[in-house]
Structure formats: structure tokens, C-alpha cells
């Protein structure tokens, strides 16, 4: 039996001097111990998800905690049967969370160490979910919400997180005077976004401390009132949260049956994320439209080594065809 892999999810807002130089040092250490993952380092802090065996992840946590800036950094730990990443990336960025505020002439100077929403533990957050007078706002991207979300949470009409501030401004009259609680995967986005909401004048703003990941591991709430699965930005794609009465809410793009398996459209110029069973992925060569299924650079066809005849036969089976190849 192979050894379990641990996946570490973490962040910390803290001032990092010479952050670009520190990012290079961080990458060097990670590679030296064989860690895999993706880490962002900025002047405002660090945000990462990494994976490795027990010994490797323990070495990494000990090394991070040995730096007084990160002595109290909170690692959220999952155990998996296989690696969540294939390579190791550590990148320097201007911010570990980009709200896109400056793009909309918003005040972009948000420091979660100075201004942020009230922390709610899982029990308090569950109580907020059950409170009819509390507005629960999902701050993630649309495709994350579609895979899973808290029951009754608002799905903003946005495609990605950077569009959320404008959406809130456009709809603030609906809940400006109400209690608003926000949530995200691990908490890093909510730290900054809830601070922005406080700056915007919202009187009562809370956030799920530690994010959905912590809620799912809490021994008391056990992820209850979460519907579906949680989207994660690694090879796992999704992880279970509700251990009381789990449900599947997402539906297969092709036949509408319950499905939590996300794939990207095989047309590299489309890349749309869709839910699809392995059977339907093969049947529709992972294309979200007739054009994508017949695209000359269809990645499913390339990855699976389909001959042109085999490709044509699959399309013919669903009433479609490949374009004719001109004779030379």
C-alpha cells in the first residue's frame, strides 16, 4: 500500500521585505526536499497549496514555522492517495489576492491586518446560514459555486472574483443595512474582500474563518448545509465537504445526470470548464460544441491518439461530421 500524500493549504497576511528575493529562496528550499505545489509570495504575505509525503510536508511546515514571520501560520491538512501537483511553482506577485479594484477606480489600498470582517468559526457560520436575516455571499468564481456551495448562499452574477466589487456596488442597496457574511475556499480572499466591504460602509460584515476547508473538517458541524463538492485549484479538482448528508448538485453538460467531474473543453481556444462523465467525455471527444468537437487541434483526439477515421466515427455516432480535407 502506497504512503498517503498530505496536501497543505495555507496563507498569511504579513509584511515581507524583499519579497521577490524571498520567493526565489522559498522555491529553492521546496525543490530541495521534493515538494510539489503552487505558492504566491508578495509584499503583503504568502498564499499556497503544496503536497508531498508525510516526511516532506513535515520538513516544509517546520521550515516555514522556523521563520518568526510565519511562526503561527495555520496549515490546513488533507490526506490523499496521490499527489495533487506535478511540479513546484513559487511566484512573486504584487498581491497574493487581486481584487481588481484599481481597474474600476476603487480604493485598492486594503490591508487585512488593519481592516477585515469579523471572524466566524464553523458553528457561528452555521448559525448564520440558518438566520433568515443574514445575507450569505459566495465570493468565489462562478464555476466554483456551480460545483458546490452553502445552502441559501447568494451566487453573484459574475464570472470571476475580480468582478465581485462592482457587483456588490451595483446591488448594495439590497443588503447594505443587513448582516453580511462571506466565504471562500480557505479564507484568503475573504480576508481582503470583507475588509473592502467594511470600507464601503457595510455595518456588519463577517467571514468564515479558515474557509470552506475548515468548515468541512470541524467535528461539530461536519460540513452540514454544504451542497455539492468544493472546487480546488490542483489535480484533485474537487473535495468532499458535507459528511452528514452529502449531495451532488452539478449536472453532466451532455445529458443532465448528476456529475461532479470537471473537464476543460478540448478545443484549446475555448477551454470552457464543463461537467462530464468519462463515458460522455469519450463520446463527445470532450468538445462543448460541434465546432469544438471537430476542431483541428482537439486535445482529446491528440491525447488519446485517435486516428482521423476513429474521430469521424465518434462524431458520426452523435450526428456530426468532420470537415472535408482538401485534396492536394
Curated annotation (Swiss-Prot):
CDD domains hit by this protein: RHOD_YceA (cd01518)
Pfam families: Rhodanese, Rhodanese_C, UPF0176_N
EC annotation from Swiss-Prot or TrEMBL: 1.14.-.-
GO biological process, one term: tRNA modification
Extent of the signal sequence: none
Domain Rhodanese: 130-224
Enzyme class: oxidoreductase
Residue positions of the active site: 184
Catalytic activity: uridine(34) in tRNA + AH2 + O2 = 5-hydroxyuridine(34) in tRNA + A + H2O
Alphabetic keyword roster: Oxidoreductase, tRNA processing
GO MF: oxidoreductase activity, acting on paired donors, with incorporation or reduction of molecular oxygen
Family: Belongs to the TrhO family.
Described function: Catalyzes oxygen-dependent 5-hydroxyuridine (ho5U) modification at position 34 in tRNAs.
HAMAP family xref list: TrhO
NCBIfam families: PRK00142.1-3, PRK00142.1-5
Protein name from the UniProt record: tRNA uridine(34) hydroxylase
Amino acid at each position: 500500500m502506497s504512503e498517503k500524500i498530505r496536501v497543505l493549504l495555507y496563507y498569511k497576511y504579513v509584511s515581507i521585505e524583499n519579497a521577490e528575493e524571498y520567493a526565489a529562496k522559498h522555491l529553492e528550499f521546496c525543490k530541495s526536499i521534493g515538494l510539489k505545489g503552487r505558492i504566491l509570495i508578495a509584499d503583503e504575505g504568502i498564499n499556497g497549496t503544496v503536497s508531498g509525503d508525510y516526511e516532506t510536508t513535515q520538513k516544509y511546515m517546520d521550515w516555514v514555522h522556523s521563520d518568526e514571520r510565519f511562526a503561527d501560520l495555520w496549515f490546513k491538512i488533507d490526506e490523499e492517495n496521490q499527489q495533487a501537483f506535478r511540479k513546484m511553482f513559487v511566484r512573486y506577485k504584487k498581491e497574493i489576492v487581486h481584487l481588481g479594484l484599481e481597474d474600476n477606480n476603487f480604493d485598492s489600498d486594503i490591508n487585512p491586518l488593519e481592516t477585515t470582517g469579523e471572524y466566524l468559526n464553523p458553528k457561528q457560520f452555521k448559525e448564520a446560514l440558518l438566520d433568515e436575516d443574514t445575507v450569505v455571499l459566495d465570493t468565489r468564481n462562478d464555476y466554483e459555486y456551480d460545483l458546490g456551495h452553502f445552502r441559501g448562499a447568494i451566487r453573484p452574477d459574475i464570472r470571476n472574483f475580480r468582478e465581485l466589487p462592482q457587483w456588490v456596488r451595483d446591488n448594495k442597496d439590497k443588503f447594505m443595512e443587513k448582516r453580511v457574511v462571506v466565504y471562500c475556499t480557505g479564507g484568503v480572499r475573504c480576508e481582503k474582500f470583507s475588509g473592502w466591504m467594511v470600507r464601503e460602509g457595510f455595518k456588519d460584515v463577517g467571514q468564515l474563518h479558515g474557509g470552506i476547508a475548515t468548515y468541512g473538517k470541524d467535528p461539530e458541524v461536519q460540513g452540514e448545509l454544504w451542497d455539492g463538492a468544493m472546487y480546488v485549484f490542483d489535480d484533485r479538482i474537487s473535495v468532499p465537504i458535507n459528511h452528514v448528508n452529502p449531495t451532488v448538485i452539478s449536472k453532466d453538460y451532455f445529458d443532465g445526470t448528476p456529475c461532479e467531474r470537471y473537464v476543460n473543453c478540448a478545443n484549446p481556444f475555448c477551454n470552457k470548464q464543463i461537467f462530464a462523465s468519462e463515458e460522455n467525455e469519450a463520446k463527445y471527444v470532450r468538445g462543448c460544441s460541434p465546432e469544438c468537437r471537430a476542431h483541428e487541434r482537439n486535445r482529446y483526439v491528440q491525447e488519446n491518439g485517435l486516428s482521423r477515421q476513429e474521430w469521424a466515427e465518434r462524431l458520426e455516432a452523435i450526428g456530426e461530421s468532420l470537415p472535408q480535407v482538401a485534396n492536394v
